[in-house]
Amino acid sequence: MEPRTDGAECGVQVFCRIRPLNKTEEKNADRFLPKFPSEDSISLGGKVYVFDKVFKPNTTQEQVYKGAAYHIVQDVLSGYNGTVFAYGQTSSGKTHTMEGVIGDNGLSGIIPRIVADIFNHIYSMDENLQFHIKVSYYEIYNEKIRDLLDPEKVNLSIHEDKNRVPYVKGATERFVGGPDEVLQAIEDGKSNRMVAVTNMNEHSSRSHSVFLITVKQEHQTTKKQLTGKLYLVDLAGSEKVSKTGAQGTVLEEAKNINKSLTALGIVISALAEGTKSHVPYRDSKLTRILQESLGGNSRTTVIICASPSHFNEAETKSTLLFGARAKTIKNVVQINEELTAEEWKRRYEKEKEKNTRLAALLQAAALELSRWRAGESVSEVEWVNLSDSAQMAVSEVSGGSTPLMERSIAPAPPMLTSTTGPITDEEKKKYEEERVKLYQQLDEKDDEIQKVSQELEKLRQQVLLQEEALGTMRENEELIREENNRFQKEAEDKQQEGKEMMTALEEIAVNLDVRQAECEKLKRELEVVQEDNQSLEDRMNQATSLLNAHLDECGPKIRHFKEGIYNVIREFNIADIASQNDQLPDHDLLNHVRIGVSKLFSEYSAAKESSTAAEHDAEAKLAADVARVESGQDAGRMKQLLVKDQAAKEIKPLTDRVNMELTTLKNLKKEFMRVLVARCQANQDTEGEDSLSGPAQKQRIQFLENNLDKLTKVHKQLVRDNADLRVELPKMEARLRGREDRIKILETALRDSKQRSQAERKKYQQEVERIKEAVRQRNMRRMNAPQIVKPIRPGQVYTSPSAGMSQGAPNGSNA
């Protein structure tokens, strides 16, 4: 883009950018309100707003830069001033538009791209040009200017130079030699900028930031110097407290932000109307800094950022109205050129020649006027053509004058006065001198206020440093006290643990002695039990041998007795027993014999009783018959009695035989019973011996064996416990010695810690004093030491340590 001519009038360029709906708005199903009738217009609420260009939500960062800010680079390098600032409500995308993601070719904003393009243009310009580039970065936070490159500089004041151009006095100016250094300055400033979290934005800017790039170029041959300033402004967004939920400090920040933006809107409105003689630039520091950008000597580009959401419709309309008003503002731009002595001399000669010509023309006009007044008629050919001369003079003035000269010959604005007559040149000069004097006094007061503020800030910083040092010392003392208490508590705990361990060891030793005594006692009892067991075993063996011998002796008798029993059984026809005589054991055989004998005895008794009863009946009948016979009543009956008597006599041998057999049976029974009793007695003796040496002895033996097993187990457990305790005893003693050593070490460490803390405290105080002295010395040196300028010559490729970054930014801007 070719630079405009000096004194050219140009309007403020306004571009509109609509961001996409964010996640919250999409989640709330907000409607997308704006419509785009054309590339340079936007419709909202039935009203159409026209700007230089409208960027839709899908517009990339590169397209925004190419369309809105690319031409500013050439203007700045041609000696013009330039301004780019973004305006809009909070969370509308201003910081994203101005800064973006630095280092990302796709997401980087206007500032990194414009920085890269400035150096790319410099590298392609005439090699006889030498550039001096310096940057400043400051913010307006709560109506106070803070230096972002030096956070210690706060509440900086605004002054005016000899051309009545406002500037921030005392702001750090860092000379740079490449895009990397500029981006590093931006990163340093961003880390010091005020941001906060609100309901509408996680990284809400709480201040207006101004990044100023001053490019001064000098031609080595002609010594011609041009100076261009580029203001890159990121405004904080206007806020509604009901939406952002601001409280406390954030609320106060929002108030100051809205106040400065309101002052900016008033200035825009005053400039847009063009009828007001006074524009309130001094109402806010923001408008004071942007004074040249709004209605002054600057090519200004305004990017209004707006939200498309129905939720923010009112703020979006206000933003669009602001842009429409700003578009009507007209600036008068001039080249900031510093002339050499030869150029001033040439222009002086030219002005002198022009004045001579004008003087001759004025003299000719005066002669013509005198002739007319004298009544002489002057022919038309002799008339002096003042219009051509005036046009020539004006063209010469406009073509050869400098901005400084034009400012010097420009009429001063009328001063307010109480006189009703015309203001003379002397009064005008007087008023001008008074105004200059008042401005000088105002600047002096600003300087005094600035000095007092700086001194106050230094004192405040010193107080803060002292408080921090005191707080640190108190914290260190508290930490040391806590550590001391902790060490003491640990030492007491260790001592208590040592005492408990000694007590436990003593108890273990006592228990060990008791267990050893019990073990010895159990050993003795075990020996006694073993001896008793051995004697019982011997007695059992003897009883067993005696029993076997007795059984051997009784074997033939038992067999003889069995044979007798079998004979008796055969005689009495006990078939069931006879058939089982070979299979039944002795005791079963005896039982069966007892049953058989009892049965025979019962039959014998029954037969004896029946025969006795029959005999008694027969005797009774016989006596009765004898009585009847004696009485002679029945002879026949007598005969019968005789027959019966004869029968009785015949039966008597049988009865005798039965009686003899019964006697034999009784004798046999007695013998059998005797043998059986003897056998049973022998069995009872044997069983008695068995009972004496059997269940009771076995039960006692079992009891003793169980006790023996238990005692054996207890003995083994005691032996194992004793062995374990003997193994653990050296470990416990070692641990006890270790704990005692640890207690001693902790006590020593506690003493050393106290000594170190005291030494560190003294060292810290000395270090604080040294740092303060170094800061004092550095500040003293800064006051008198010059700045080192980094010249840049076109045609020489710039190399930096981070070449990738310097290469990536230009490519991203030219893509």
Swiss-Prot record:
GO cellular component, one term: kinesin I complex
Disulfide-linked positions: none
SMART domains (alphabetical): KISc (SM00129)
Disruption phenotype: Conditional knockout in PVD neuron results in a complete microtubule polarity reversal in the anterior dendrite. Conditional knockout in motor neuron reduces the number of mitochondria in the axon. RNAi-mediated knockdown results in reduced dendritic branch formation in PVD sensory neurons. RNAi-mediated knockdown results in an altered distribution of recycling and late endosomes. RNAi-mediated knockdown results in defects in nuclear migration in hyp7 hypodermal precursor cells.
Residues that, per the record, bind ATP: G88, Q89, T90, S91, S92, G93, K94, T95
Transmembrane segment boundaries: none
InterPro entries: Kinesin-like_fam, Kinesin_motor_CS, Kinesin_motor_dom, Kinesin_motor_dom_sf, P-loop_NTPase
Region of interest (Disordered), residue spans: 788-815
Annotated signal sequence range: none
PROSITE patterns: KINESIN_MOTOR_1, KINESIN_MOTOR_2
Keywords: ATP-binding, Coiled coil, Cytoplasm, Cytoskeleton, Microtubule, Motor protein, Nucleotide-binding, Transport
GO biological process: anterograde axonal transport of mitochondrion; anterograde dendritic transport of neurotransmitter receptor complex; axon guidance; embryo development ending in birth or egg hatching; establishment of meiotic spindle localization; establishment of meiotic spindle orientation; establishment or maintenance of microtubule cytoskeleton polarity; locomotion
Record keyword Transport present: yes
Localization (cell): Cytoplasm, Cytoskeleton; Cytoplasm
Pfam families per UniProt: Kinesin (PF00225)
Domain (Kinesin motor) ranges: 11-329
Biased composition regions of type Polar residues, renumbered to the chain: 797-815
An example Gene Ontology molecular-function term: microtubule binding
Segments forming a coiled coil: 335-374, 422-554, 695-785
Function: Microtubule-dependent motor protein required for organelle transport. Plays a role in endosome transport. Required for the transport of mitochondria along the axon of motor neurons. Involved in the nuclear migration of hyp7 hypodermal precursor cells. Required for the formation of dendritic branches of PVD sensory neurons. In non-ciliated neurons such as the PVD and PHC neurons, required for the organization of minus-end out microtubules in dendrites. Also required for the minus-end out orientation of microtubules in dendrites of AQR gas-sensing neurons.
Domain remarks: Composed of three structural domains: a large globular N-terminal domain which is responsible for the motor activity of kinesin (it hydrolyzes ATP and binds microtubule), a central alpha-helical coiled coil domain that mediates the heavy chain dimerization; and a small globular C-terminal domain which interacts with other proteins (such as the kinesin light chains), vesicles and membranous organelles.
Recorded family membership: Belongs to the TRAFAC class myosin-kinesin ATPase superfamily. Kinesin family. Kinesin subfamily.
Subunit structure, interactors included: Oligomer composed of two heavy chains and two light chains.
Stated name of the protein: Kinesin heavy chain
Gene that encodes it: unc-116
